A protein has these predicted regions:
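Extended C-terminal regions of large enzymes
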Residues: 13, 150, 157-159, 164-500
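Protein-protein interaction/assembly regions in multi-subunit complexes
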Residues: 1-194, 199-214, 220-239, 252-274
Length: 500
């Protein structure tokens, strides 16, 4: 496996042998190592000295369920510290087929004599790197951009791309990836890494793995035995069965019962309309509607959990894919909205802009606190999201996330840690996750170490310190393997399958 290093200023590609010290690093572990070694801690996140690292997990490409995730890393314009966000989809798989252990993108595209650099596509294949103008798709939403690129390059490629939010360098912008059905629905959402990509004037990265090979396995027989055990443990786990039925929205009832469902700008942890936005209600609704609706859907090839979904409207036509728990919590209950159709429309708009639904839900909650909308008013929320697409001053304030919205609008209740919005787990009710928010270098991020499933008194702060620490260590390991958080169901039953 190699490290591919792209220098944007020189428009060059170097393929380097990965150091031996990196042989057991992948995903978050590898991106963190590279950033710590190569990026000045005091650099401007949107300046030329910041680097963007794409690192597939160690298990990516080996046909393990839920283990094809890709980590994106950079210094964050939101937290101002080291940041990793990961996503499912097909990009990591294509990278490993091309022999990439990591892709490092450094510098910025040079400007012409008028100070303009335009927008660019980076095309990567076994033949090397190619830079192509992208001004014809600048300003387009994620869905239209992906559609045009697939027509141009064919449906066999993988694509990592940004939407208008990334082009505007908004701090809540993420990086979208294609799922197994070629839909740009898998976003590395958190921390503003889409803005970092935008600062480098890259609209999209195209990965063409034609002629590539699957990554090598040192001991194929041992791997197969561990694979069988992992697959069995994953399939047999009761949580897998719950997610196969209801997906991540199954957490709505659970968190509401805990008092951990963010409600009206985190002023409460229980929502009177929780039942109408629950996973159980959504499943019944989608089954009745049929058409393009899917109650379960895999974002990666071969995933047995299939916790994703496609949310169809009354006519059965898809509105958005996926509609996840975090989005329901932040764009639903956190805004006092109890209608899934409205939440789905908001989700679609946020995703097409290339924004993080968590930070957008929190930013709109702050806007409601400031009097710019009433809690429960979904149409007004959609109007505020339209301000972002227009690029108005108000839209840019909201697009920078909840922390910026709070500072500009003078709101004191702002649910952020290290500048990043809290996920849909109220920290006063789930204190282990709250401890993770506070102690993780990544800020408020449930994927850094969520403790909701721990067998502990969630209201006992001291008892949850060790719980949070263990969860953070486990998640760092899963992120380095390229494993979805739910793949942990299989690993934690028999942890020995990992070293095997």
């Amino acid at each position: 496996m190699q490290v591919w290093r792209v220098n944007l200023r020189e428009r060059s590609l170097e393929r380097e042998a990965a150091p031996e010290a990196w042989s057991r690093l992948g995903g978050r572990g590898l991106s963190a190592r590279i950033l710590l070694d190569e990026v000045p801690a005091t650099c401007e996140p949107l300046g030329p000295h910041n680097k963007m690292v794409l690192a597939p997990g160690l298990l990516v490409g080996h046909m393990l369920s839920s283990c094809d995730r890709l980590s994106f890393g950079a210094k964050s314009p939101m937290t101002r510290g080291i940041k990793e966000a990961n996503a499912g989809g097909s990009t990591g798989l294509h990278m490993t087929n091309l022999g990439m252990q990591a892709l490092i993108i450094e510098g910025q595209m040079p400007r012409d004599g008028r100070g303009a650099s335009g927008w660019w596509l980076l095309h990567l294949s076994l033949d090397g790197a190619r830079f192509e103008p992208a001004d014809d798709i600048a300003g387009l939403g994620v869905n239209e951009t992906a559609s045009r690129l697939l027509k141009r390059y064919g449906d066999k490629v993988a694509i990592a791309l940004i939407g208008p939010a990334g082009e505007m360098l908004l701090s809540a912008a993420g990086i979208q990836n294609l799922d197994k059905d070629r839909v740009p629905s898998r976003i590395a959402a958190r921390g503003g890494l889409g803005a970092v990509m935008g600062s480098k004037r890259l609209k999209a990265i195209i990965f063409d793995d034609a002629g590539g090979q699957k990554p090598p396995i040192a001991n194929r027989e041992a791997f197969r035995q561990a694979q069988k055990l992992f697959n069995k443990n994953t399939l047999d786990h009761p949580q897998t069965k719950a997610y196969q039925e209801y997906g991540t929205p199954a957490m709505v009832r659970t968190c509401n019962a805990f008092g951990g469902l963010p409600t009206r700008n985190f002023s409460s942890g229980q929502f009177e309309g929780a039942e109408t936005i629950s996973g159980e209600h959504m499943r019944d609704l989608l089954l009745r509607r049929g058409g393009e609706s899917e109650t379960t859907h895999a974002c990666m090839l071969g995933c047995v959990i299939q916790c994703s979904n496609t949310y169809g409207g009354e006519d059965g036509k898809a509105i958005v894919s996926p509609l996840e728990y975090e989005t329901i919590g932040l764009l639903g209950s956190n805004l006092g909205i109890a209608d899934l159709d409205t939440v789905a429309r908001m989700n679609q708009e946020v995703s097409d802009l290339g924004l993080d639904t968590i930070d957008m839900g929190a930013a709109l909650g702050v806007a409601a606190e400031a009097g710019l909308m009433q809690f429960g008013d979904g149409e007004r929320a959609l109007q505020l999201l339209a301000e972002i697409r227009k690029g108005t001053p108000l839209g840019r304030i909201l697009g920078h996330g909840a922390a910026m919205a709070g500072r500009v609008l003078g709101v004191l209740r702002v649910p952020v840690v290290k500048g990043q919005a809290m996920s849909a787990y109220e920290p006063r009710a789930i204190k282990g996750t709250g401890t993770t928010y506070v102690t993780s270098p990544q800020g408020a991020d449930h994927t850094a170490g969520n403790t909701i499933r721990a067998k502990v008194d969630h209201l006992d702060a001291k008892a949850n310190i060790a719980t949070s620490r263990a969860a953070q260590i486990n998640m760092a390991g899963f992120d380095s393997l390229g494993a979805c958080i739910f793949a942990g169901f299989g690993f934690m039953v028999n942890p020995e399958v990992i070293p095997d």
